């Protein structure tokens, strides 16, 4: 593939994004993403531009009309609050410098793992219980 991403993956400035409709817990989804090679994880979203690309991918993959499958059409990303920690991290270990939390006050209190929301056309995320099974998006090195 000329852009360095495999079939079904979308090139972005930060690597390749892949959407998987299989519904897994956050930790199983992260393990699945790591199989794609060194530096592969559940997607970290570094900027508004990257979030737009990701939202386009998800809306194209899922219809994005509010009728997403699974747990209300949520999609895991790599943001989580590790056990015993008060701060959110990406699954690659980096601190989030960009955020797009859903506007409700409780958006950060629903759990320790973050999922994009179908209701917002995948442009915002909210905390969910990490054991919830959702579709997910991986980011791999190009």
Swiss-Prot record:
Localization, UniProt: Secreted, Extracellular space, Extracellular matrix
Disulfide-linked positions: 5-16, 33-138, 113-130
SMART domains for the chain: CLECT (SM00034)
All copies of domain C-type lectin, residue ranges: 12-139
Residues of this chain annotated as glycosylated in UniProt: 59
Coiled coil: none
CDD domains found in the cross-reference section: CLECT_REG-1_like (cd03594)
Entry GO terms, CC: extracellular matrix; extracellular region; extracellular space; organomineral extracellular matrix
Keyword vocabulary terms for this entry: Disulfide bond, Extracellular matrix, Glycoprotein, Lectin, Phosphoprotein, Secreted
Expression (tissue specificity): Expressed in the shell gland mucosa. Not detected in hen liver, magnum, isthmus, cartilage, bone or in egg white or yolk.
Any one GO BP annotation for this protein: biomineral tissue development
Phosphoserine PTM positions: 61, 67
A molecular function GO annotation: peptidoglycan binding
Pfam family of the protein (one): Lectin_C
Functional summary from the UniProt entry: May form proteinaceous networks during the construction of the eggshell which then may control the deposition of the mineral phase.
Protein name: Ovocleidin-17
Organism: Gallus gallus
